[in-house]
């Protein structure tokens, strides 16, 4: 049994340090790692909610997008001229996703949130965890780590244990756009409010470019 919780009390949680390799995007693109990550996501989506009690959060990416847009408008972002267009694209994406099944998702599947300790993978940084569509975690994993079309098809087919339907693929592509839009807007907000010594302007540029590329595939 893996026990990483060292202590907990109301408002406090102490975890043991995990020795291991923090994965890179290139690592995630290796089939050997994808074959470990997929069952991890299955367990997360299927089992975590069964262990929880009390109030639970929901992470609906389109609400998050609207909230970030509102913050950027209120705080006079340097990108204010782009916000109406991004808001409209968010509406288009939400309509494209349509009805969803709810699972308990991680919702922040950056490569740096996976640690390989030599015997298993750990998924860390659960700040955004909450109920969401399973398509968001799958799309988030794909868009954050540059999976190929073949890898995306493998991921969807093996997650749902069925051939990939046009509807599933369309929702997945919309969620990839939404994932990149959320990351872009988060970076824009961080430009204004973060105290970290990090080039958020460049990070915004990189993510906006990736979003534009994905949008052109979603809505050519």
Residue spans for each PLM region:
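ATP-binding pocket architecture of kinase catalytic cores
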Residues: 3-60, 64-82, 99
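Active-site acidic catalytic loop and adjacent metal/ATP-binding pocket
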Residues: 5, 91-136
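A general structural signal marking secondary-structure boundaries and capping sites
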Residues: 41-52, 97, 145, 163, ...
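All-alpha amphipathic helical-bundle segments outside canonical DNA-binding/catalytic cores
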Residues: 56-59, 165-176
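N-terminal alpha-helical segment
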Residues: 64-65, 86, 134, 180
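ATP/Mg2+ or Mg2+-diphosphate-binding catalytic cores
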Residues: 71-74, 78-81, 185-220
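Short amphipathic alpha-helical segments and their helix-coil junctions
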Residues: 118, 153-171, 207, 211-218
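Active-site activation/catalytic loop segments of kinase-like enzymes and analogous catalytic loops
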Residues: 135-164, 177-195, 210
